[in-house]
Amino acid sequence: MSTHAPLAGRGALITGGGGGIGSASARLLVRDGASVTLMGRTEETLRKAVARLREDAAEGAELRYFVGDATDAESLSDALRCAAEPAGGLHMAVAVVGKGGEFTPLLMLDEQTFVERLRLNLVSAFLLIRQAAPPIAAAGGGSIVCISSDAARLAFPYLAGYTTAKAGLEALVRVAALELAPLQVRVNAVRPGLLRTELTEYLFEEPELLQQFLEQKPLGRLGSPEDVAAGVRFLAGPESGWMTGQSFGMEGGNELTRAPVLDGMARKRVGDAAFEAAMAGRPPEPADDS
């Protein structure tokens, strides 16, 4: 338990709070005294995360969880009210919810999957920014942090939905930062590379793919949720008080090189024949999106 609490008296909401980045970010916030509410869709996951995090919380820091859908505006509003109660206001919000991994050639990507990637990675962040800004402004100002991806800057093939959503997210961060600056609400983003979390565990069973990622990282290792959490903590707190509208990479230097070759994952996902047909401009008939 920490005795130094620079975030004491501040309330925070983290969407996707039960996952790797969400819970790692929460740990650093509560360690520095913030009262944090984790939002997610699975109560058991949230309950276990809160139980683990209590061991690291500074004196007076409160931990809560709220079961709800971050892509639903009404549910999100309820979660924000819950997060504001312990500290008497909301000062920080972190948008972690997202999903990637379609590994499908563009000519085979169905509309439903594409739109779903936008909903989870972009619309969820839009809703959090829109819903969190008024209570943060009412509390005297604060910070909103979004989780982007190095896919926003690098052209990752076969991930059209995910890369489009993350690029859009960073544009949203800039627009929101400009509009909300008079309210003293800062909006920034962290841009991680590949991390080992419960959502990406299946990728770590692909040694050739991991080698592709490692070869493009000058620092020579993959990241952890704790690496990204350090960036979230900086952007959420007063240490970054003169920063807004920024998206910065925490990806081992990957943006200095290029995206990995993902042909193998796409072939595994759709099959060799379909992959080759799509890349030759003759994709199989698309599935019914209805």
Where is each model-derived feature located?
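Short C-terminal tail/terminal secondary-structure segment
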Residues: 2, 103, 244-290
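Conserved glycine-rich cofactor-binding loop
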Residues: 11, 18-20
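Substrate-binding pocket helix/loop in short-chain dehydrogenase/reductase
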Residues: 104-106, 110-115, 213
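Active-site helix of classical SDR
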Residues: 129, 165, 173
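Alpha-helical segment proximal to the catalytic Tyr-Lys
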Residues: 134, 178-179, 241
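Residue(s) in the substrate-gating loop at a strand-loop-helix junction
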Residues: 149
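Short, small/polar-rich loop/turn modules that mediate ligand/substrate recognition or access, typified
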Residues: 181, 186, 243-245
